[in-house]
Design a protein with these regions (language model features):
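Acidic, glycine-rich loop-and-beta core segments that form the ion-binding/anion-interacting portion
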Residues: 51-52, 64-85
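Outer-membrane beta-barrel domain signature
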Residues: 34-35, 69, 97, 135
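Short consensus segments that form the blades of beta-propeller domains
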Residues: 7-10, 68-73, 136-139
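Beta-rich accessory regions
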Residues: 75-203
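Asp-box/BNR beta-propeller loop motif
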Residues: 20-28, 86-90
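Hydrophobic core segments of beta-strands in well-ordered, beta-rich domains
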Residues: 1-9, 15-17, 28-31, 36, ...
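Conserved Ser/Thr-centered positions that define the repeating blades of beta-propeller domains
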Residues: 17-20, 148
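Short glycine-/Asp-/Thr-/Trp-enriched loop segments that recur within the blades
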Residues: 37-43, 101-104
């Protein structure tokens, strides 16, 4: 099947479901979802997959309005969890949630790895803050791939384990005592860290 993001006559987002037996000739089936101006306008870059016993839908709506801390004005990436009835091609979903709260996260897509993991990668480039210098031969970048799971209806995201192959400068410290809520550790340099910390309160 193919899920095509589009917009209705009133400008609100909707998703058209197409099916094919040969990936060449396609048949339109139905509108599988419509936001009716509830979640932004045009729905872009849909992704639709089963994960941990439920059906996940990810879309990237344009021109959304902020709702407290949950969304921000402009282009967002949101997800729904729900149930999909294959026979009737009916999707029943819950409320939208933000995929990522960063302002430059857009158009996430997922793949299923050969060992069965669902991995997501997205585009880091805000359309509202296009700041690429003219002399650069590239614009934007991609996120670190994330392994996805669903827990209690929420999308859980973890960096893929393969990234550990690129770790350098490992350091280990034991029995570090915190004084005034802070401690300075020697030999730590770099811009990004992955830390595992075990904390024990003194008796």
């Amino acid at each position: 099947f193919a899920l095509i993001g589009s917009k209705a006559e009133d400008g609100s987002g909707q998703l058209a479901l197409f099916t094919s037996e040969d990936a060449i000739h396609w048949n339109y089936e139905k509108m599988i979802d419509q936001c009716k101006n509830r979640y932004g306008k045009m729905w872009e870059c849909p992704d639709f997959f089963a994960l941990d016993g439920c059906q996940v839908l990810i879309v990237s709506p344009q021109f959304m309005r902020a709702e407290g801390l949950e969304f921000h004005n402009g282009n967002n990436s949101i997800y729904f969890t729900g149930d999909y009835e294959k026979e009737t091609m009916t999707y029943t979903r819950g409320d939208a949630r933000q995929v990522d709260y960063g302002m430059d996260f857009y158009a996430p897509q997922t793949v299923e790895t050969t060992d069965g993991r669902r991995v997501m990668i997205a585009w880091l480039q805000s359309w509202d803050n296009f700041m690429t210098p003219e002399d650069m031969d590239w614009t934007g970048l991609m996120t670190i791939p994330r392994e996805l799971h669903v827990k209690d209806g929420s999308l859980v995201q973890l960096p893929v384990r393969e990234i550990e192959n690129y770790y350098t400068g490992e350091r280990s410290y034991e029995n570090v005592t915190l004084e005034n809520q802070s401690a300075e550790l020697d030999g730590i340099t770099g811009r990004s860290f992955d830390m595992t910390v075990e904390v024990k309160k003194e008796d």
